[in-house]
Amino acid sequence: VTLQELNDEWCKVTYESYTGYVKSSLLTSEAVTPGIGEKNRVQKIRSTLDANMSLNKPSGLTLEDFKKILSNNASDTNKIFEQNAEVFYNVEQKYNINGIFLASMAIHESGWGSSKIAKDKKNLFGFGAYDRSPYDSAVTFATYEEGIETVAKYLVKNYINEKNAKIYNNETATGTYYNGPTLVGISTRYCTDKDWPTKVYKYMNYLYERL
């Protein structure tokens, strides 16, 4: 028996040339369907993906998940994201921010690390850049890790948590630009591109599908 689809009540399964539906409660054993535990875990994580999901909490992915989905991407020609998969995971755990969102934002802003700002300044987000002189104004980081962590802290403190919300290291959020912990909420004060949420979500969806 091979599991094709799974929800709380029903499973779509195949056996040889047959396809049918059975109650989920009947297919909860690895002995009945090898791999069902992992498939169920992945499907539950994927089911949380939504364009309006809250980004001020971890994704639920493991370190191995991060390594898997950020490895062997043809567009990641310099292996920047592959080499920093653990950084995105650790930042997620440390600061309570969805690490897949953060990686997707970096992919979008840097063109998979191919932008001049990303390569010269190890700045995957265009952080600090102004429209009139983006390269000159963008912050320079010593490492990609430093840049990822800096932007994560900045978003947690100013964008995705309400004022006075408890955040990392017993600090409180300023909530300066808070308009909700979602892509649309962030983009309201973060950028001028009205399609920014859609563009970032496209990469989030791509990465979640690689689980």
What are these model-derived regions, one by one?
Residues N7-Y15, Y21, L26-F101, W112-L211:
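Catalytic cores of secreted/periplasmic lytic hydrolases that degrade extracellular macromolecules
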Residues T2-E5:
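A structural signal for short, hydrophobic beta-strand segments that form beta-sheets
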Residues E109:
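Pyridoxal 5′-phosphate
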